[in-house]
Protein backbone atom coordinates (compact mmCIF):
# COMPACT_ATOMS: atom_id res chain seq x y z
CA UNK A 1 0.00 0.00 0.00
CA UNK A 2 1.51 3.31 -1.05
CA UNK A 3 1.61 6.16 1.43
CA UNK A 4 0.57 9.52 0.01
CA UNK A 5 1.86 12.60 1.85
CA UNK A 6 -0.81 14.86 0.40
CA UNK A 7 -3.48 16.12 2.80
CA UNK A 8 -6.94 16.63 1.34
CA UNK A 9 -9.50 18.54 3.38
CA UNK A 10 -12.41 18.08 0.99
CA UNK A 11 -15.60 17.05 2.78
CA UNK A 12 -16.91 14.63 0.14
CA UNK A 13 -20.48 15.98 0.48
CA UNK A 14 -21.37 15.65 -3.22
CA UNK A 15 -19.83 12.23 -3.75
CA UNK A 16 -21.26 10.93 -0.48
CA UNK A 17 -24.83 11.26 -1.79
CA UNK A 18 -24.54 11.38 -5.58
CA UNK A 19 -22.33 8.36 -6.19
CA UNK A 20 -24.16 5.77 -4.06
CA UNK A 21 -27.54 6.79 -5.52
CA UNK A 22 -26.29 6.61 -9.12
CA UNK A 23 -24.42 3.34 -8.57
CA UNK A 24 -27.36 1.69 -6.78
CA UNK A 25 -29.74 2.58 -9.63
CA UNK A 26 -27.24 1.41 -12.26
CA UNK A 27 -26.62 -1.85 -10.38
CA UNK A 28 -30.33 -2.65 -9.94
CA UNK A 29 -31.14 -1.95 -13.61
CA UNK A 30 -27.98 -3.08 -15.40
CA UNK A 31 -27.47 -6.52 -13.82
CA UNK A 32 -30.80 -8.06 -14.97
CA UNK A 33 -30.69 -6.05 -18.21
CA UNK A 34 -27.25 -7.34 -19.13
CA UNK A 35 -28.08 -10.90 -18.10
CA UNK A 36 -31.05 -10.69 -20.45
CA UNK A 37 -28.82 -9.15 -23.10
CA UNK A 38 -26.34 -12.02 -22.71
CA UNK A 39 -29.15 -14.51 -23.37
CA UNK A 40 -30.45 -12.58 -26.38
CA UNK A 41 -27.00 -12.12 -27.92
CA UNK A 42 -26.19 -15.80 -27.34
CA UNK A 43 -29.31 -16.79 -29.27
CA UNK A 44 -28.38 -14.38 -32.06
CA UNK A 45 -24.86 -15.83 -32.23
CA UNK A 46 -26.34 -19.34 -32.53
CA UNK A 47 -28.34 -18.12 -35.54
CA UNK A 48 -25.08 -17.43 -37.43
CA UNK A 49 -25.40 -13.73 -36.62
CA UNK A 50 -21.92 -12.27 -36.12
CA UNK A 51 -23.42 -9.24 -34.39
CA UNK A 52 -24.41 -11.52 -31.52
CA UNK A 53 -20.71 -12.16 -30.77
CA UNK A 54 -20.02 -8.45 -30.31
CA UNK A 55 -23.20 -7.94 -28.31
CA UNK A 56 -22.36 -10.87 -26.05
CA UNK A 57 -18.89 -9.45 -25.35
CA UNK A 58 -20.34 -5.98 -24.72
CA UNK A 59 -22.94 -7.34 -22.30
CA UNK A 60 -20.34 -9.45 -20.50
CA UNK A 61 -18.07 -6.42 -20.08
CA UNK A 62 -20.95 -4.34 -18.70
CA UNK A 63 -22.03 -7.12 -16.35
CA UNK A 64 -18.54 -7.64 -14.92
CA UNK A 65 -18.30 -3.93 -14.18
CA UNK A 66 -21.81 -3.81 -12.70
CA UNK A 67 -20.87 -6.59 -10.27
CA UNK A 68 -18.11 -4.35 -8.83
CA UNK A 69 -20.57 -1.52 -8.10
CA UNK A 70 -21.46 -2.73 -4.57
CA UNK A 71 -17.79 -2.18 -3.67
CA UNK A 72 -17.86 1.35 -5.12
CA UNK A 73 -21.16 2.04 -3.35
CA UNK A 74 -19.56 1.11 -0.03
CA UNK A 75 -16.46 3.17 -0.87
CA UNK A 76 -18.31 6.37 -1.76
CA UNK A 77 -20.85 6.02 1.05
CA UNK A 78 -17.93 5.86 3.49
CA UNK A 79 -16.59 9.17 2.08
CA UNK A 80 -13.98 7.57 -0.16
CA UNK A 81 -12.68 5.23 2.50
CA UNK A 82 -11.72 1.84 1.04
CA UNK A 83 -12.52 -0.71 3.75
CA UNK A 84 -11.66 -3.80 1.71
CA UNK A 85 -8.31 -5.31 0.78
CA UNK A 86 -5.89 -3.61 -1.65
CA UNK A 87 -6.35 -6.62 -3.95
CA UNK A 88 -10.08 -5.92 -4.23
CA UNK A 89 -9.28 -2.28 -4.98
CA UNK A 90 -6.96 -3.28 -7.81
CA UNK A 91 -9.49 -5.77 -9.17
CA UNK A 92 -12.33 -3.23 -9.06
CA UNK A 93 -10.24 -0.58 -10.81
CA UNK A 94 -9.13 -3.16 -13.40
CA UNK A 95 -12.71 -4.15 -14.29
CA UNK A 96 -13.85 -0.51 -14.26
CA UNK A 97 -11.33 0.59 -16.87
CA UNK A 98 -11.64 -2.73 -18.67
CA UNK A 99 -15.32 -1.91 -19.13
CA UNK A 100 -14.72 1.68 -20.22
CA UNK A 101 -12.42 0.78 -23.08
CA UNK A 102 -13.61 -2.68 -24.08
CA UNK A 103 -17.09 -1.13 -24.36
CA UNK A 104 -15.88 1.56 -26.75
CA UNK A 105 -14.05 -1.12 -28.76
CA UNK A 106 -17.08 -3.41 -29.04
CA UNK A 107 -19.36 -0.46 -29.84
CA UNK A 108 -16.95 0.43 -32.65
CA UNK A 109 -17.08 -3.15 -33.95
CA UNK A 110 -20.88 -3.06 -33.92
CA UNK A 111 -20.92 0.26 -35.80
CA UNK A 112 -18.47 -1.07 -38.41
CA UNK A 113 -20.45 -4.30 -38.79
CA UNK A 114 -23.72 -2.39 -39.36
CA UNK A 115 -21.94 -0.06 -41.79
CA UNK A 116 -20.65 -2.98 -43.88
CA UNK A 117 -24.04 -4.72 -43.74
CA UNK A 118 -25.94 -1.68 -45.02
CA UNK A 119 -23.46 0.07 -47.33
CA UNK A 120 -21.49 -2.94 -48.63
CA UNK A 121 -23.78 -5.96 -48.10
CA UNK A 122 -21.84 -8.24 -50.49
CA UNK A 123 -18.38 -6.73 -50.93
CA UNK A 124 -16.93 -7.42 -47.47
CA UNK A 125 -18.93 -10.46 -46.42
CA UNK A 126 -15.77 -12.20 -45.13
CA UNK A 127 -15.56 -9.52 -42.42
CA UNK A 128 -19.08 -10.33 -41.28
CA UNK A 129 -18.69 -13.94 -40.23
CA UNK A 130 -18.95 -15.44 -36.75
CA UNK A 131 -15.36 -16.62 -36.99
CA UNK A 132 -14.06 -13.12 -37.73
CA UNK A 133 -16.24 -11.62 -34.97
CA UNK A 134 -14.99 -14.21 -32.47
CA UNK A 135 -11.32 -13.59 -33.33
CA UNK A 136 -11.85 -9.82 -33.16
CA UNK A 137 -13.64 -10.01 -29.80
CA UNK A 138 -11.01 -12.32 -28.35
CA UNK A 139 -8.27 -9.95 -29.54
CA UNK A 140 -10.01 -7.02 -27.83
CA UNK A 141 -10.27 -8.92 -24.54
CA UNK A 142 -6.57 -9.86 -24.70
CA UNK A 143 -5.38 -6.36 -25.64
CA UNK A 144 -7.54 -4.63 -23.02
CA UNK A 145 -6.35 -7.08 -20.36
CA UNK A 146 -2.76 -6.37 -21.34
CA UNK A 147 -3.10 -2.57 -21.32
CA UNK A 148 -4.98 -2.57 -18.02
CA UNK A 149 -2.66 -5.09 -16.37
CA UNK A 150 -0.49 -2.16 -15.26
CA UNK A 151 -3.22 -1.37 -12.73
CA UNK A 152 -2.69 -4.77 -11.10
CA UNK A 153 1.02 -4.18 -10.53
CA UNK A 154 0.81 -0.63 -9.24
CA UNK A 155 -0.15 0.28 -5.68
CA UNK A 156 -3.68 1.53 -6.20
CA UNK A 157 -4.36 2.67 -2.63
CA UNK A 158 -3.05 5.61 -0.68
CA UNK A 159 -3.58 6.92 2.86
CA UNK A 160 -4.97 10.31 3.70
CA UNK A 161 -4.64 11.92 7.17
CA UNK A 162 -6.99 14.90 7.10
CA UNK A 163 -10.24 13.69 8.62
CA UNK A 164 -10.38 14.72 12.26
CA UNK A 165 -12.82 11.91 13.03
CA UNK A 166 -10.44 9.21 11.77
CA UNK A 167 -6.80 8.41 12.28
CA UNK A 168 -6.59 7.75 8.53
CA UNK A 169 -8.67 6.48 5.68
CA UNK A 170 -7.74 4.72 2.49
CA UNK A 171 -8.29 6.02 -1.02
CA UNK A 172 -8.63 3.71 -4.01
CA UNK A 173 -6.88 4.74 -7.24
CA UNK A 174 -8.26 8.27 -7.74
CA UNK A 175 -5.23 10.10 -6.42
CA UNK A 176 -4.66 13.84 -6.62
CA UNK A 177 -2.53 14.95 -8.33
CA UNK A 178 -2.06 12.30 -11.00
CA UNK A 179 1.20 10.42 -11.07
CA UNK A 180 3.30 10.53 -14.24
CA UNK A 181 2.48 6.95 -15.27
CA UNK A 182 -1.25 7.70 -14.84
CA UNK A 183 -0.97 10.79 -17.07
CA UNK A 184 0.78 8.83 -19.83
CA UNK A 185 -1.71 5.96 -19.59
CA UNK A 186 -4.69 8.35 -19.63
CA UNK A 187 -3.41 10.17 -22.73
CA UNK A 188 -2.97 6.84 -24.54
CA UNK A 189 -6.45 5.68 -23.48
CA UNK A 190 -8.11 8.93 -24.50
CA UNK A 191 -6.63 8.73 -27.99
CA UNK A 192 -6.97 5.01 -28.69
CA UNK A 193 -9.93 4.14 -26.47
CA UNK A 194 -12.13 7.20 -26.95
CA UNK A 195 -11.20 9.58 -29.80
CA UNK A 196 -10.67 6.95 -32.51
CA UNK A 197 -13.80 4.92 -31.57
CA UNK A 198 -15.92 8.09 -31.41
CA UNK A 199 -14.79 9.27 -34.86
CA UNK A 200 -15.31 5.77 -36.29
CA UNK A 201 -18.80 5.41 -34.81
CA UNK A 202 -19.89 8.86 -36.02
CA UNK A 203 -18.60 8.23 -39.56
CA UNK A 204 -20.20 4.76 -39.75
CA UNK A 205 -23.55 5.97 -38.40
CA UNK A 206 -23.53 8.91 -40.80
CA UNK A 207 -22.85 6.59 -43.76
CA UNK A 208 -25.63 4.23 -42.63
CA UNK A 209 -27.97 7.22 -42.22
CA UNK A 210 -27.29 8.37 -45.79
CA UNK A 211 -27.73 4.85 -47.18
CA UNK A 212 -31.03 4.35 -45.36
CA UNK A 213 -32.35 7.79 -46.26
CA UNK A 214 -31.74 7.24 -49.99
CA UNK A 215 -33.03 3.66 -50.02
CA UNK A 216 -36.35 3.69 -51.90
CA UNK A 217 -37.27 0.17 -50.76
CA UNK A 218 -37.36 1.12 -47.08
CA UNK A 219 -40.63 2.54 -45.74
CA UNK A 220 -40.58 6.03 -44.23
CA UNK A 221 -41.64 4.76 -40.79
CA UNK A 222 -38.78 2.26 -40.80
CA UNK A 223 -36.36 4.96 -41.94
CA UNK A 224 -37.42 7.20 -39.06
CA UNK A 225 -37.00 4.36 -36.58
CA UNK A 226 -33.49 3.53 -37.83
CA UNK A 227 -32.44 7.20 -37.87
CA UNK A 228 -33.70 7.69 -34.29
CA UNK A 229 -31.77 4.61 -33.19
CA UNK A 230 -28.56 5.84 -34.85
CA UNK A 231 -28.98 9.25 -33.21
CA UNK A 232 -29.63 7.64 -29.81
CA UNK A 233 -26.55 5.43 -30.09
CA UNK A 234 -24.28 8.35 -31.01
CA UNK A 235 -25.76 10.64 -28.37
CA UNK A 236 -25.45 8.00 -25.64
CA UNK A 237 -21.80 7.39 -26.47
CA UNK A 238 -21.07 11.13 -26.41
CA UNK A 239 -22.94 11.77 -23.15
CA UNK A 240 -21.49 8.79 -21.29
CA UNK A 241 -17.84 9.03 -22.35
CA UNK A 242 -17.10 12.58 -23.54
CA UNK A 243 -17.37 14.46 -20.19
CA UNK A 244 -15.10 11.90 -18.52
CA UNK A 245 -12.39 12.11 -21.19
CA UNK A 246 -12.55 15.90 -21.37
CA UNK A 247 -11.92 16.04 -17.62
CA UNK A 248 -9.15 13.44 -17.93
CA UNK A 249 -7.38 15.63 -20.49
CA UNK A 250 -7.81 18.73 -18.32
CA UNK A 251 -6.39 16.89 -15.32
CA UNK A 252 -3.44 15.62 -17.35
CA UNK A 253 -2.59 19.19 -18.39
CA UNK A 254 -3.14 20.83 -14.99
CA UNK A 255 -1.54 18.13 -12.84
CA UNK A 256 1.49 17.27 -14.98
CA UNK A 257 3.92 19.36 -12.90
CA UNK A 258 1.71 19.96 -9.87
CA UNK A 259 3.10 19.69 -6.36
CA UNK A 260 1.37 17.19 -4.06
CA UNK A 261 0.39 20.01 -1.68
CA UNK A 262 -1.07 22.23 -4.41
CA UNK A 263 -4.87 22.29 -4.03
CA UNK A 264 -5.56 24.66 -6.95
CA UNK A 265 -6.94 21.84 -9.10
CA UNK A 266 -9.22 20.30 -6.49
CA UNK A 267 -12.38 21.74 -8.09
CA UNK A 268 -11.40 20.09 -11.36
CA UNK A 269 -10.90 16.81 -9.52
CA UNK A 270 -14.41 17.05 -8.03
CA UNK A 271 -15.98 17.59 -11.47
CA UNK A 272 -13.90 14.68 -12.78
CA UNK A 273 -15.36 12.43 -10.09
CA UNK A 274 -18.89 13.32 -11.20
CA UNK A 275 -18.05 12.36 -14.80
CA UNK A 276 -16.80 8.97 -13.55
CA UNK A 277 -20.29 8.30 -12.17
CA UNK A 278 -21.78 9.39 -15.49
CA UNK A 279 -19.86 6.73 -17.43
CA UNK A 280 -21.58 4.00 -15.40
CA UNK A 281 -24.87 4.86 -17.13
CA UNK A 282 -23.43 3.23 -20.24
CA UNK A 283 -24.07 -0.17 -18.62
CA UNK A 284 -27.79 0.60 -18.64
CA UNK A 285 -27.91 2.17 -22.11
CA UNK A 286 -26.04 -0.61 -23.95
CA UNK A 287 -28.51 -3.50 -23.47
CA UNK A 288 -31.49 -1.21 -24.12
CA UNK A 289 -30.11 0.32 -27.32
CA UNK A 290 -28.45 -2.74 -28.82
CA UNK A 291 -30.57 -5.72 -27.76
CA UNK A 292 -34.06 -4.64 -26.72
CA UNK A 293 -34.96 -1.93 -29.28
CA UNK A 294 -34.68 -4.20 -32.33
CA UNK A 295 -37.54 -6.48 -33.32
CA UNK A 296 -35.23 -9.51 -33.32
CA UNK A 297 -33.89 -8.66 -29.87
CA UNK A 298 -37.36 -8.16 -28.42
CA UNK A 299 -38.58 -11.39 -30.01
CA UNK A 300 -35.64 -13.37 -28.59
CA UNK A 301 -36.17 -11.83 -25.15
CA UNK A 302 -39.86 -12.67 -25.29
CA UNK A 303 -39.02 -16.27 -26.26
CA UNK A 304 -36.60 -16.52 -23.32
CA UNK A 305 -39.24 -15.22 -20.90
CA UNK A 306 -41.84 -17.66 -22.29
CA UNK A 307 -39.37 -20.53 -21.96
CA UNK A 308 -38.58 -19.61 -18.36
CA UNK A 309 -42.29 -19.25 -17.56
CA UNK A 310 -43.05 -22.60 -19.19
CA UNK A 311 -40.30 -24.32 -17.20
CA UNK A 312 -41.53 -22.69 -14.00
CA UNK A 313 -45.12 -23.81 -14.64
CA UNK A 314 -43.94 -27.32 -15.50
CA UNK A 315 -41.92 -27.42 -12.28
CA UNK A 316 -44.93 -26.25 -10.27
CA UNK A 317 -47.09 -28.88 -11.97
CA UNK A 318 -44.58 -31.60 -11.08
CA UNK A 319 -44.57 -30.41 -7.47
CA UNK A 320 -48.39 -30.58 -7.37
CA UNK A 321 -48.34 -34.11 -8.85
CA UNK A 322 -45.77 -35.24 -6.28
CA UNK A 323 -47.79 -33.66 -3.47
CA UNK A 324 -50.97 -35.34 -4.73
CA UNK A 325 -49.28 -38.75 -4.90
CA UNK A 326 -47.76 -38.27 -1.45
CA UNK A 327 -51.14 -37.31 0.02
CA UNK A 328 -52.85 -40.31 -1.61
CA UNK A 329 -50.12 -42.65 -0.31
CA UNK A 330 -50.53 -41.23 3.18
CA UNK A 331 -54.31 -41.81 3.10
CA UNK A 332 -53.80 -45.39 1.88
CA UNK A 333 -51.33 -46.05 4.69
CA UNK A 334 -53.85 -44.74 7.22
CA UNK A 335 -56.54 -47.08 5.82
CA UNK A 336 -54.16 -50.05 6.01
CA UNK A 337 -53.32 -49.22 9.61
Swiss-Prot record:
This is G-protein coupled receptor 65. Belongs to the G-protein coupled receptor 1 family. Induction: By glucocorticoids, during apoptosis of immature thymocytes. It is found in: Cell membrane; Early endosome membrane; Late endosome membrane. The chain crosses the membrane at residues 8-44, 49-79, 85-120, 129-155, 177-214, 219-254, 265-293. Disruption phenotype: Mutant mice are healthy with no signs of spontaneous colitis or inflammation, however are more susceptible to bacteria-induced colitis in comparison to the wild type. One of its GO terms (cellular component) is plasma membrane. The record marks 144 as: Required for activation.
